[in-house]
Amino acid sequence: MSEYTLENIAQVVEILREKSPLTHCITNVVTVKDCANAVLAVGASPIMANAPEEAEEIVGISNSLVINIGTLTKEQIETMKKSAKFAIENNKPFILDPVGVGISNIRNQTPIDIITNSKPSIIRGNLSEIKAIAMMYDILDECTMAKGVDVAQCDIINKDTLISNCNLIKNISEKLNTTIAVSGPIDIISDGHDVYTIENGDAMMSRITGSGCMLGCVLGAYLAVTNPLEAAITGTLVMGIAGELAAKTARDNNKGTGSFGIYLIDELSKLNKSTILSQSKLNKM
Amino acid sequence: MSEYTLENIAQVVEILREKSPLTHCITNVVTVKDCANAVLAVGASPIMANAPEEAEEIVGISNSLVINIGTLTKEQIETMKKSAKFAIENNKPFILDPVGVGISNIRNQTPIDIITNSKPSIIRGNLSEIKAIAMMYDILDECTMAKGVDVAQCDIINKDTLISNCNLIKNISEKLNTTIAVSGPIDIISDGHDVYTIENGDAMMSRITGSGCMLGCVLGAYLAVTNPLEAAITGTLVMGIAGELAAKTARDNNKGTGSFGIYLIDELSKLNKSTILSQSKLNKM
Amino acid sequence: MSEYTLENIAQVVEILREKSPLTHCITNVVTVKDCANAVLAVGASPIMANAPEEAEEIVGISNSLVINIGTLTKEQIETMKKSAKFAIENNKPFILDPVGVGISNIRNQTPIDIITNSKPSIIRGNLSEIKAIAMMYDILDECTMAKGVDVAQCDIINKDTLISNCNLIKNISEKLNTTIAVSGPIDIISDGHDVYTIENGDAMMSRITGSGCMLGCVLGAYLAVTNPLEAAITGTLVMGIAGELAAKTARDNNKGTGSFGIYLIDELSKLNKSTILSQSKLNKM
């Protein structure tokens, strides 16, 4: 229940660059390269492996694990379950990114299996995804169906819905006994006790594929060097600030979404202590 | 058999940005991220899913479907067949991009199965691919083998071969009872009645991977908001114009093919009504 | 045992652009698009296919083959074995890139099977990977475990360890009867008789994913037009020079690793005879 200052966060950013932990990402085929480059850009060392035959060996040498269900296959689901189980048995922290949960049966069953059998350190997603998870655990009675892998229109967090959503996320986090990181125009992070909001970021982030997936992998990298709540705050700030700076560069140079995606990795790779201290819009509720 | 004006096309471009339909792409692992970013750039919302277990659920929530056979696996072939069948039964338009048809048995059998059992709204490809399809349906007696996934040298459409190729494409389109979109230095599009040609584009587009795949997915996005012929014309114009503008920027700044690929997404994301009206080189034959 | 001059190398660079051979890459899902774009950038024509059902057909039409084990699946392992066997039976040169060998059982068994049953023309990797291969063939008694898919700290080649590592690589190459290309701050290439070192490149190359994978595919492209030793020297010089120029552009413009990755493809696509002659840092030991 400690309070995290920007000084703490800036330190975590630097520690990751010093320690360069091995971050294992079992993720989708759409954005896997951007995920690897994002992990490298913030200073960690990524590995991506999908075969169930090597699941335990790879988790065994890794410092943390990311599970992103964006493009599941039967084989990958097996790898995810084995990896999550092995991670929890060996005290390796891991994050679950339940992309598109709520829109198909395997996108519901895979997260349920992983959450129930191998409690993740962090679950991250957009509000529609987190609500879909909450509904499956009877924490919520109803939720709006997401638009594919994107958030439902009514689940976009704004000033008016912030307080109620903060309470909701705190409640879900407490019930599931895990840290929850929700991304949106305003990000909400809770460990069931405290709630933080972050107002960094830019709307351009939702005009490219991979912003959410990269965030999940960056959180996974920070999980290797600090506790889940601080990892979630740090990674969300880092991605939000990088997104903001990248969008500014894209607009200033009359570029579109292609260049924005490249500038985002640029900013992640250049980001340091002073960027965190000067740019962060972090609030404790 | 209506005639499409640039005003019509420009309207379709704007309608896609307003409606942002969900475009489901079952596509190859090489260019899948560029496909998602291209769909986002023109204003639609992409989803990529490969598991047969969720095929019907994902098609069920999507507004249109793209099937690209670039890197087939046994599992993905099953997903494609189920998805195409479900799409046709539920009146969801879909486009088939038979990448490399003619070079292997599974690249022949998969399109045949899909075309025969679940008529696509559009089939798009380079001339070698479309001729390979035509030969399998006894519309053509012979064709030149493509160079891998690239067009055969003798199948590059130019001024001299334009008329005969237009007649050929119209004939194939009529026989297969579907819209055909052939890309090349001059693009040819026919619904079996009318034939349109487009002279936008740049040779640099064939020096990166994914130009054809992105085109297929962009056509798929427009399929969600208009009829196959207009969708094919609109998407082909949009990609061609974006390619032209991106190549100019790359050359003006002494950049190579890496930057060109990024500028292409930039231009897709910036393209609007006035770009269409001022840049289009569309002819009705 | 001939000596390769920069004139020879520059000629190979030009011949690849003229002949544009079909280069088949069975590679990982992380960097597959960059691999295709790198192959296109140096002038060859890439094809990527993973299904065992079409393995022999695709190798049959290809001029050379690349096998990269970065993200193995059961199906892909089958494709690799069939493809390697068919390549060797049909005198198609191929290169093996044993990504992460030493860190899991399938990453050990797959290269062993391929090396033993279908001798590759080139094996390329970082020093940790090549040492792991050597240990499995009893050429070395011990080696340091790599850090995931990255080189172990103690295996980074520098001035002090250069001579001993050159001798080691020459020995491994002789014993395995294949050309070995080791990448690092100083690259070492040997065919068991001669040893060449290359000091081009930039540290930024290890801050993005895919530098090694792209190198493997570029070597594969050159394998289609010359012998393994000259192909390895040419491809390593080409990638190193492109990396150096790209890093300079990134630094001069205060860009990060995202832009660097794009500039790398730019430089590969612009590289010509005069770049080779003016920039190469090639030494025969």
UniProtKB/Swiss-Prot annotation, chains A, B, C:
Pfam families for this protein: HK
A GO BP entry: thiamine biosynthetic process
UniProt signal peptide: none
Catalytic reaction list: 5-(2-hydroxyethyl)-4-methylthiazole + ATP = 4-methyl-5-(2-phosphooxyethyl)-thiazole + ADP + H(+)
EC number in record: 2.7.1.50
Amino acids binding ATP: R124, S183
Gene3D superfamilies in the cross-refs: 3.40.1190.20
Keyword annotations: ATP-binding, Kinase, Magnesium, Metal-binding, Nucleotide-binding, Thiamine biosynthesis, Transferase
Sections of the chain in a coiled coil: none
Known pathway: Cofactor biosynthesis; thiamine diphosphate biosynthesis; 4-methyl-5-(2-phosphoethyl)-thiazole from 5-(2-hydroxyethyl)-4-methylthiazole: step 1/1
Superkingdom of this protein's organism: Archaea
A molecular function GO annotation: hydroxyethylthiazole kinase activity
KW Nucleotide-binding (keyword) present: yes
Listed cofactors: Mg(2+)
NCBIfam families, alphabetized: PRK09355.1 (NF006830)
Function text: Catalyzes the phosphorylation of the hydroxyl group of 4-methyl-5-beta-hydroxyethylthiazole (THZ).
Family (UniProt): Belongs to the Thz kinase family.
Protein name: Hydroxyethylthiazole kinase 1
Gene from which the chain derives: thiM1
